[in-house]
Amino acid sequence: MNILNKAIVIAGPTGVGKTKISIDLAKKLNAEIISSDSAQVYRGLNIGTAKIREEEKEGIKHHLIDIVEPVLKYSVGNFEKDVNKILNQNSEKNFLLVGGTGLYLNSVTNGLSILPEADKKTREYLTTLNNQALLELALKYDEEATKEIHPNNRVRLERVVEVFLLTGQKFSELSKKNIKNNNFKFLKIALERNRENLYDRINKRVDIMFAQGLVDEVKNLYKIYGDKLYSLNIIGYNEIIDYINAKISLDEAVYQIKLNSRHYAKRQFTWFKADKEYQWFNLDGISEQEIVKTIYTLFNIKA
């Protein structure tokens, strides 16, 4: 596929300050923003996901916010298809992909793997095997992948065997092959802050969420969706549901949300650092205006 177009990725951990920079850059480039956040796709989940408010958009068009009900599953595959449809149908426009869900961003910039979807009949057969029989099959079909899996991890072992039974090819080989379904070249930008400052921003943001009415938001959603809301496993919602169900105190919920958010930020940082194509900017060492100016220049000189 010929590379004809360019787009920018603005990534980084939760609370780092992606929103302000992306808005300023979008205005400078006359660009549209594609939200790349696995939680902001859900309608009604506003405060807890730090969803951008209408007045904060400053007239910039945003995509993939509030597109599905919380009862519906929205996967990385859905995201990849939706984003590529937007990109490929509007190739003359400038786009910023902004968010912290690394798996989602990677599916667009590098493509999705060609591994087959789960097969019900194959899964039913594999559940009849005991652990030793399953392990022996996995070693037979794909020794390389199996050696990286704990012998008692049935889920991963079943997947190794399933892929071979469905395709006749090894999981370890197929998982390295991706299909990229767009003709865009991506300038990958990642934002960071010194850890102490980032964690302080996260803690303060959680306090603001509670002041804005997070508890009431979750209560209202829980009345509508019940445990289906809990199954989304979104930080800020599960903790409040536990509070609603008297499993923890409100103070404990606040503490857990802050702790889980900090842990999530650490995982995000690790994910993006592993991708060497990202160019990093530390917001504690350079102004937002300088970062926007630099990204603008990079975008216009990159072939």
From Swiss-Prot:
Region called Interaction with substrate tRNA, residue ranges: 37-40
EC numbers: 2.5.1.75
Annotated ATP binding sites: 12-19
Cofactor(s) listed in the protein's UniProt record: Mg(2+)
Interaction with substrate tRNA, annotated site positions: 101
Segments crossing the lipid bilayer: none
A Pfam family that the UniProt record links to this protein: IPPT
Domain of life (superkingdom): Bacteria
Catalyzed chemical reaction(s): adenosine(37) in tRNA + dimethylallyl diphosphate = N(6)-dimethylallyladenosine(37) in tRNA + diphosphate
GO MF, any single term: tRNA dimethylallyltransferase activity
Keyword ATP-binding among record annotations: yes
GO biological process terms on file: tRNA modification
Residues the entry annotates as binding substrate: 14-19
Stored SUPFAM superfamilies: P-loop containing nucleoside triphosphate hydrolases
UniProt entry keywords in alphabetical sequence: ATP-binding, Magnesium, Nucleotide-binding, Transferase, tRNA processing
Entry annotated with the keyword Acyltransferase: no
Family: Belongs to the IPP transferase family.
NCBIfam families hit by this protein: miaA (TIGR00174)
Subunit-level organization: Monomer.
Function, as annotated: Catalyzes the transfer of a dimethylallyl group onto the adenine at position 37 in tRNAs that read codons beginning with uridine, leading to the formation of N6-(dimethylallyl)adenosine (i(6)A).
Record protein name field: tRNA dimethylallyltransferase
